[in-house]
Amino acid sequence: MTNIRKTHPLAKIVNDSFIDLPAPSNISAWWNFGSLLGVCLILQIMTGLFLAMHYTSDTATAFSSVTHICRDVNYGWIIRYMHANGASMFFICLFMHVGRGLYYGSYVFMETWNVGIILLFATMATAFMGYVLPWGQMSFWGATVITNLLSAIPYIGTNLVEWIWGGFSVDKATLTRFFAFHFIFPFIIAALAMVHLLFLHETGSNNPSGITSDSDKIPFHPYYTIKDILGILLLLSVLMSLVLFSPDLLGDPDNYTPANPLNTPPHIKPEWYFLFAYAILRSIPNKLGGVLALVFSILILALIPHLHTSKQRGMMFRPLSQCLFWLLTADLLTLTWIGGQPVEHPFIVIGQIASILYFAILLILMPTISIIENNLLKW
């Protein structure tokens, strides 16, 4: 008799995706982040659902409803901090996942890569809207500053901003719609993640060597299921350590002050995972130019497959490109640091240099170095 998991219409999909899936035998721990992102998403949806049961999306009660969750709801504090710090873990995994894709040339799978970019944008939008919900000072002013950037769009900008706000400032209408979108977006992200996997399974996984692994495949289960479980346990250990020992480490103290439109905080800054993009935005004196640079800092990923000039797929055997990749990593860390600093000398200049370097590495230096490496292969 044929096994039910191979014949049942639903079980067959699960079987072909997670059990009998042929996987390369040499994929490293850098390939763990996809499953970790799935775990993060499930965790965020679950904790978010329980938070939504007690949260009220009204400017008068939003802040106190979050306080109520932390003080009065059974284990509300741990659910709230798991959700807040879960977002940080989500973005750590996202950055590692994208970095792995850049390093090993996974962007050659164009459909998978492009869906991944859409996923990144959707996750960033969700996180931004979620940050507004507690209705603290940084929530309010962050929402005001970031939505206001759209006013830089010529002709329709001002109307667009007021349409998003639902009025002439960030107010009750804005909070209500942000809550609605923040609730629905994770489910859209889950659907997109399935599309992401669908496209990936059309081609099969890449591997560290960058050469085809068709001649040496192993079943996903038990080899990679057990490997993923180890990754998940490590992720949960880090998350729970953060939640239980220093839940406010990555947050902003200003967000413990209720939103006040009459009092601007001295330094308006987003959560740490947006600081690199925020630094790029601030390093350009022109408003429209800054907004374009902000969008392009992520959208540039869509150009990466078209800028691939190397004869080899990954960077495993390309030491010069490796140096550039780690320079890019250091540059992004520098931008993250600058994004959290006040706008004054020398931070302005450092931010501008780091921003120029970011675009130069991806658009000019990497393709050039790849051509040089191709020529070195001839020697």
Swiss-Prot record:
Q: Could you tell me the superkingdom of the organism this chain comes from?
A: Eukaryota
Q: Which Pfam families match?
A: Cytochrom_B_C, Cytochrome_B
- Recite the UniProt cofactor note for this protein: Binds 2 heme b groups non-covalently.
The entry's localization annotation reads: Mitochondrion inner membrane
Q: Where are the transmembrane segments?
A: 33-53, 77-98, 113-133, 178-198, 226-246, 288-308, 320-340, 347-367
Which CDD domains does the UniProt record give? cytochrome_b_C, Cytochrome_b_N
One of the protein's GO biological processes: mitochondrial electron transport, ubiquinol to cytochrome c
Q: What is this protein called?
A: Cytochrome b
Q: What is the lineage of its organism?
A: Eukaryota, Metazoa, Chordata, Craniata, Vertebrata
- The coding gene here is MT-CYB
